[in-house]
Amino acid sequence: ISCSLVGSEMCIRDRFGCGVDCASETELMMAYALDYKPGEIMFSSNDTPAEEYAYANEIGATINLDDITHIDFLDKILDGKFPETMSCRYNPGGYFQLGTSIMDNPGDAKYGMTHDQIIEAFKILKSKGVKHFGIHSFLASNTVSNEYYPTLAKILFELAVELRDKTGADIKFINLSGGVGVAYKPEQTPNDIAVIGEGVHKVYDEVLTPAGMGDVAIYTELGRFMLAPYGCLVTKAIHEKHIYKEYIGVDACAANLMRPAIYGAYHHITVAGKEDAPCDHKYDVTGSLCENSDKFAIDRMLPKIDMGDYLIIHDTGAHGFSMGYQYNGKLRSAELLLKENGDVQMIRRAAVSY
């Protein structure tokens, strides 16, 4: 749910048979309100408050433990009555590589259990009555490579066999989580989900099937991949500033889309009605927050922008509105849904008060 908190989008995803991964009590409440069933809700949180664990258990969400110490914490919350199915999050440490390219550094990540910890966690949970187990891991974000999932799958499939052999645990599912990204830059080659699926299938047949584990379900968290390309932030040019650089000030800001400000993330920008015009002007595109990082683009080549032009900031369907905030007292914008028949529906009103 973290990639998009819009209830109507969640209903659309439900129509295609998707479950939901939740990271907070609020997200759990949304999933429950939208009638997601217990087997369709995963609760993957960290540094989790007691009341959130209690609520997750109450609605039948599958709890994905981030740390081995949470077992005792959960034991007290649930009065020793553990659910029959639970999952544990794995962190292999070190660097995660695809070929010779370092994709991320799990050893610096706050998430998950070490190799020895997850083995011990399965043993403890089994002794407390847990009957069915899942494994979860997230090792890299927004990869634009068809090799990420198959590489991660091999790590987790081999771990699953080891856990089964060393603990006797019944492994019901392996969650490859997120990480399959989108091509934010026009020159990038998009991921091919069919190729990715075949790669995972190949590793499954090489590792799990020969081990007698050919019935293990595979879960994924493809929120960004499914939603990012299908949303955009539309903003109006309202100021032009000429100092040491050329600035275009717009009526949106990082409170509407914070990825460029906090990650330095690239989002493609087009100017409505000037899609075919030459990109021969260099601009920084800025919002009005009292932060110099409030920039949607830096030194971006764009067509000449006139006041009143609408700028289309692309690929904001995931981690756009849902990451918004209210710094400087900024209010949330409206959200519109473009339907298949061309109709436009307002799915969230603009905020009118703080």
Predicted segment positions?
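Single conserved hydrophobic/aromatic residue that forms the stacking wall/gate
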Residues: 1-7, 11-12
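Glycine-enriched alpha-helix->loop->beta-strand junction motifs that scaffold or abut catalytic
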Residues: 15-19, 35-40, 54-63, 79-85, ...
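Catalytic beta/alpha-barrel core
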Residues: 17-26, 40-48, 61-69
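Conserved, mostly hydrophobic/aromatic
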Residues: 24, 56, 88, 135, ...
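Short active-site loop/helix that positions an aromatic residue
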Residues: 28-34, 72-77
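Hydrophobic, small-residue-rich alpha-helical packing segments that form membrane-like cores
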Residues: 58, 64-66, 70-107
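Active-site loop/helix belt of alpha/beta enzymes
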Residues: 92-239, 302
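Charged (often Lys/Glu-rich) extended helix/loop segments that serve as interaction or gating elements
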Residues: 208, 213-354
